[in-house]
């Protein structure tokens, strides 16, 4: 199943940035009509080397998606345990406090919007909230302290961090479901042994 996580962009390059500036300079010096139909379509589609409202919305959507997964997973696991007849135990609990997963993901940026300092702070705070929930790989990017002077590397790091958080959450989820399944299998084996079969 495809999700917003599959749309994250973390492979921007300097060449992508250069392409944006090439087309932008062409527009500024010769006008929009100086672009070929292909260049115009490329420019209007939201270029990978630019960071604009579509990128901000994608990050907001990914934040909301991950936060929703984090907050709903405990009840999903509880329902699964109940269905399988497995009692609650700390070994089946998520390694974070779901109540602390509080984000304010903005997903309605439009062309021309400029992030205010408070919106930029909230944008980065969302990343901080999600990042601190799980133990991530040692090379996981840090949350940037500001969006001022944003580079393509920082933009890549923001979206790669979200990818890693989601991947780690998926691994945690799979392990917790597996623990429940192994418990059920162990009970079935024990019952089989003690029933004389």
Where are these regions (language model features)?
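Extracellular "spike/adhesin" assembly and maturation modules
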Residues: 1-197
């Amino acid at each position: 199943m495809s999700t917003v996580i599959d749309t994250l962009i973390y492979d921007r390059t300097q060449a992508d940035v250069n392409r944006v500036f090439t087309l932008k300079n062409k527009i500024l010096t010769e006008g929009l009509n100086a672009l070929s139909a292909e260049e115009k379509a490329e420019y209007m589609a939201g270029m990978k080397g630019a960071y604009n409202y579509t990128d901000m919305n994608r990050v907001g959507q990914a934040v909301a998606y991950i936060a929703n997964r984090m907050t709903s997973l405990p009840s999903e696991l509880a329902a699964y345990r109940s269905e399988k007849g497995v009692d609650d135990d700390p070994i089946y609990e998520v390694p974070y406090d779901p109540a602390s997963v509080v984000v304010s993901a903005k997903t309605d940026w439009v062309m021309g919007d400029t992030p205010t300092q408070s919106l930029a702070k909230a944008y980065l705070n969302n990343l901080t909230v999600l990042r601190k929930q799980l133990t991530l790989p040692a090379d996981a990017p840090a949350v940037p302290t500001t969006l001022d002077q944003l580079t393509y590397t920082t933009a890549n790091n923001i979206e790669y961090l979200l990818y890693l958080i989601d991947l780690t959450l998926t691994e945690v989820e799979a392990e917790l479901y597996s623990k429940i399944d192994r418990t059920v299998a162990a009970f079935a084996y024990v019952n089989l042994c003690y029933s004389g079969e």
